[in-house]
Amino acid sequence: MNFNAITPDLFIGTTPAVNDYPRLRDLGVRLVINMRWERRPAPDPHRDPISFLWLPTVDSPLFPIPLRKLTNGARTAMEIIRSGGKVYAHCAEGRHRGVAMGACILVAQGYDPFEAMALIKDRRAIADPFAFYIRPRIVKFARQWEAQSLPS
């Protein structure tokens, strides 16, 4: 498992194996968000298991990440973070889909979408939040999130 701490409560990286769960637990991770279509998360065998959210997506410009999945992930992550837990977002390489999810979590925490993308790129060299098919999903999520957060 290769990962980076983006903020004190958000990590982005590669797919964790079952033997990585103790390390995640030691870091305070209470939620793992799996963005991989091709690989379902392995259950945590610990008596107090880490929660998993499987949001299968495809890493392809032909299949944009659905906003409903980004919203679901951000909402679930915010519940965990507000309760004092930490979140680990991943895809296969921690480059696109997991990065998009991480950026959306940061937006939900109040970051400007471009600041969120820059922070992730700064903390995880392989991350590519500015990819031509990833950036627009993050920006669109930010607009939608802000519109839903405005008082009516």
List each language-model region with its residue ranges.
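Cysteine-based protein phosphatase catalytic domain of the PTP/DSP
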Residues: N2-K86, V107-V139
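A phosphate-binding catalytic loop at a beta-strand-loop-alpha-helix junction
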Residues: G84-A103
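Short, amphipathic alpha-helical segments that act as regulatory/interfacial helices
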Residues: A103-L106, A142
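C-terminal domain-closing interface element
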Residues: R143-S152
